[in-house]
Amino acid sequence: MSQTETIARPYAKAVFEQAVETESVANWIDFLEIASTFVSNEAVKEHLASASFMENFLVWFEQFLVESRGEALSEQERNFLNVLNQQGRMAIVPEIATQFKQLYYSAQNVCKATVYTALALDEKQKKELQATIERNVHREVVLDVREEPALIAGVRIEYDGMVIDQSARGRLERFARMLDESRN
């Protein structure tokens, strides 16, 4: 587990518990996704440690929220950002968002599967893949499909700590390892 994951965990857990208590989980998912996008921007990343930048950023971010979702920061959202800012932890917002979603999926008994594919999958292929994984895990599956041309062909699927690598690259790597082992 990375240091960022370790640092983000208590924030994600606290926010999730508060969101469940106030029945605002969906709002928090949206808020954290938007905040993650902003904080992940390269131009923003460079200035996260600057107090004056953060003051302006928070004002600008709130204006964006008013325009995009029709409402300003809630008191809880503002407190969350202020705590992260005061502790110099704004850069971990994307990891907090990831862990928040994991907590949500776990509470809903949903499995998140990340599918890496060499070529884009059409909707029919996604639904078939989702149904196959659901049969294996015996629960609902949410797919996160990402194109990764380096796989050459096929797919690599990650869920519940498991990796199923059916990519051409993975097969070539396994074949190369077998050759190396046979030489020794």
Curated annotation (Swiss-Prot):
Subcellular location: Cell inner membrane
Organism: Dichelobacter nodosus (strain VCS1703A)
InterPro entries assigned to the protein according to its UniProt record, in alphabetical order: ATP_synth_OSCP/delta_N_sf, ATPase_OSCP/dsu
MF terms (GO), sorted A to Z: proton-transporting ATP synthase activity, rotational mechanism
Protein name per its UniProtKB record: ATP synthase subunit delta
Family in the record: Belongs to the ATPase delta chain family.
Highest taxon in the source lineage: Bacteria
Quaternary structure and interacting proteins, as annotated: F-type ATPases have 2 components, F(1) - the catalytic core - and F(0) - the membrane proton channel. F(1) has five subunits: alpha(3), beta(3), gamma(1), delta(1), epsilon(1). F(0) has three main subunits: a(1), b(2) and c(10-14). The alpha and beta chains form an alternating ring which encloses part of the gamma chain. F(1) is attached to F(0) by a central stalk formed by the gamma and epsilon chains, while a peripheral stalk is formed by the delta and b chains.
Keyword terms of this UniProt record: ATP synthesis, Cell inner membrane, Cell membrane, CF(1), Hydrogen ion transport, Ion transport, Membrane, Transport
NCBIfam families per UniProt: ATP_synt_delta, PRK05758.2-2
Known role: F(1)F(0) ATP synthase produces ATP from ADP in the presence of a proton or sodium gradient. F-type ATPases consist of two structural domains, F(1) containing the extramembraneous catalytic core and F(0) containing the membrane proton channel, linked together by a central stalk and a peripheral stalk. During catalysis, ATP synthesis in the catalytic domain of F(1) is coupled via a rotary mechanism of the central stalk subunits to proton translocation.
Lineage: Bacteria, Pseudomonadati, Pseudomonadota, Gammaproteobacteria, Cardiobacteriales
GO CC annotation, single: proton-transporting ATP synthase complex
Topology within the bilayer: Peripheral membrane protein
